[in-house]
């Protein structure tokens, strides 16, 4: 079993450009997107590290910041009772990042959801397509600049008003 200080030293030695920090007591690594598969694979495959479980992958939109987007990945090593958070900055002009779906099967649907909601493209993904929104949906609804439009839901207390104002043929 390794401790956090040892893990930090090994990450620094193996990946000198990775920025190391702390996030709620967990080790936080900010990695260039091109290095993501190598770092994630190394964390998974090193026998004494064994970060074998990807519990979460999600997107974040920092509208007004450059780079605008970020992908956050949480890995767990049950062997070491330790978590690592990976932060990968993704520019708006080229919102692509290598897939982790081939390394961690749990990344498959989470990458599809991040693509669907934020428009971040996971290159090399085996089936990157919308998972929550209809195929003909325009845009990505979790982006902070996505237009806020909605259709009011009809309930028994307001259905007469809703249906009277709908833009479809009336008798």
Curated annotation (Swiss-Prot):
Gene Ontology cellular-component terms for this entry are: plasma membrane
Question: Pfam families recorded for this chain?
Answer: Complex1_30kDa (PF00329)
Checking SUPFAM superfamilies in the record gives: Nqo5-like
| Annotated membrane topology | Peripheral membrane protein
E.C. number: 7.1.1.-
Q: What is the role of the protein in this entry? A: NDH-1 shuttles electrons from NADH, via FMN and iron-sulfur (Fe-S) centers, to quinones in the respiratory chain. The immediate electron acceptor for the enzyme in this species is believed to be ubiquinone. Couples the redox reaction to proton translocation (for every two electrons transferred, four hydrogen ions are translocated across the cytoplasmic membrane), and thus conserves the redox energy in a proton gradient.
UniProt-recorded name of the protein: NADH-quinone oxidoreductase subunit C
């Amino acid at each position: 079993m390794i401790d956090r200080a040892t893990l930090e030293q090994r990450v620094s030695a193996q990946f000198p450009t990775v920025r190391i920090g702390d996030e709620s007591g967990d080790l936080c690594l900010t990695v260039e997107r091109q290095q993501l598969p190598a770092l994630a694979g190394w964390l998974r495959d090193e026998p004494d590290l064994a970060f074998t479980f990807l519990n979460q992958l999600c997107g974040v939109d920092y509208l007004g910041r450059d780079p605008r987007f970020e992908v956050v990945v949480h890995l767990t090593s049950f062997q070491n009772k330790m978590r690592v958070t990976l932060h990968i900055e993704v520019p708006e002009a080229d919102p692509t990042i290598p897939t982790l779906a081939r390394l961690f099967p749990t990344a498959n649907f989470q990458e599809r959801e991040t693509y669907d909601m934020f428009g971040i493209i996971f290159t090399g993904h085996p089936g990157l397509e919308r998972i929550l929104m209809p195929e003909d949906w325009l845009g990505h609804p979790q982006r902070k600049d996505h237009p806020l439009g909605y259709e009011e839901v009809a309930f028994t207390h307001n259905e007469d008003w809703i249906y009277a104002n709908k833009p479809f043929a009336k008798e």
